[in-house]
Amino acid sequence: VNFYVRLQMGHGFRTNGEKVGWKNDVQGRERAYAAKDWCELPEKIMQAAERIRGVQIECRPAVDVIQRFNSPKVLIYVDPPYVLGTRHGKQYRCEMDDKDHEELIDVLLDHKGPVLLSGYDNALYNGRLRGWHREETVNYSQTASRKTEVLWMNFEPEDEEALNMIIPK
């Protein structure tokens, strides 16, 4: 419950102390801030509990977790802070520099199971993950700049249906 309350009452998406504002929308564009959502809280908590049943959550450096669970039966999905050169400014309490991204890639390349890695299109990942399957989507950042988001996979999705389960259209 505390987690859900923190999500709903958070000050924007950043966690580095930068002022981004209280969640609200006086123009009615975002139903996400409606009081009705609070009435649905018990149901949402039950849905979340069902969804994460059997999921193991670790609070350790990602590289350590990936190395510990290096097995063909373990799927790794990584959504790290995007490479600094692809975005405007620091946005996370725990940032990653290029050296950290290199270390992460080294560990992912050694992983025996399936890997999915999210990020903006960048030379570092493209160079190191040559041969991995890529799926691209074009989005616009908060500054309205065009960004290509990429999902790198160390496997080929079996078919279009499997791919749509990973990336809904």
Language model: regions and residue ranges:
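SAM-dependent nucleic-acid methyltransferase catalytic core
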Residues: 1-77, 81-89, 122, 163
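Class I S-adenosyl-L-methionine
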Residues: 56, 60-75, 82-169
